[in-house]
């Protein structure tokens, strides 16, 4: 589906939320932001997802990440539904704002439309999630179908990966978890790597004898 994608700057839209009107760029400020949509209020998967997002809010906050939800339901619906979300996930408080987009214009501008899920008013939002960097650019996007809930451990994992890669010349390998070794970017020479990573690094001994797979801890 064409539209906003990785590397694009999010539009500076003014939106109505459960915490009042906000401008997206002002809300994001210089922080990392998770902007996520859900198909509808008072639905089973969405209730579990937003509850888990609230449950993980302290972990995102530790990493300087703002949370912003969205669907096409009205604000009163959002506010009533929050009671169910918090009841289903004891101890979790939905303290992040949720955008109301009844005209379904914002989901189109943010590329969060599900082409297969519709109601009488048109296409519903997908289970989309954009991770936006401090520069207001999209760094990563998830697009899940209505039938599959998102995994907050994975969201937290990729946030850590993106933040480390923005600070160091590294990437995270397959199945990487926070605390595990990362790989040094291939455009970094060994001499440069010695300066950048004084803690040292280990080069994999490969049949090709090429020294491109170098592990370090950051």
Swiss-Prot record:
It catalyses: a hydroperoxide + [thioredoxin]-dithiol = an alcohol + [thioredoxin]-disulfide + H2O. Its EC number is 1.11.1.24. GO terms for molecular function: thioredoxin-dependent peroxiredoxin activity. Pfam families: 1-cysPrx_C (PF10417), AhpC-TSA (PF00578). PROSITE patterns: THIOREDOXIN_2 (PS51352). The active site is at 46 (cysteine sulfenic acid (-soh) intermediate). Residues 4-164 form the Thioredoxin domain. Its main location: nucleus. A motif (Bipartite nuclear localization signal) lies at residues 194-217. GO terms for cellular component: cytoplasm; nucleus. It is an enzyme of class 1 (oxidoreductase). It is found in: Nucleus; Cytoplasm. Keywords: Antioxidant, Cytoplasm, Nucleus, Oxidoreductase, Peroxidase, Redox-active center. The active site is a conserved redox-active cysteine residue, the peroxidatic cysteine (C(P)), which makes the nucleophilic attack on the peroxide substrate. The peroxide oxidizes the C(P)-SH to cysteine sulfenic acid (C(P)-SOH), which then reacts with another cysteine residue, the resolving cysteine (C(R)), to form a disulfide bridge. The disulfide is subsequently reduced by an appropriate electron donor to complete the catalytic cycle. In this 1-Cys peroxiredoxin, no C(R) is present and C(P) instead forms a disulfide with a cysteine from another protein or with a small thiol molecule. Belongs to the peroxiredoxin family. Prx6 subfamily. Thiol-specific peroxidase that catalyzes the reduction of hydrogen peroxide and organic hydroperoxides to water and alcohols, respectively. Seems to contribute to the inhibition of germination during stress. PANTHER family: MCG48959-RELATED, PEROXIREDOXIN-6. This is 1-Cys peroxiredoxin. It comes from Medicago truncatula (Barrel medic).
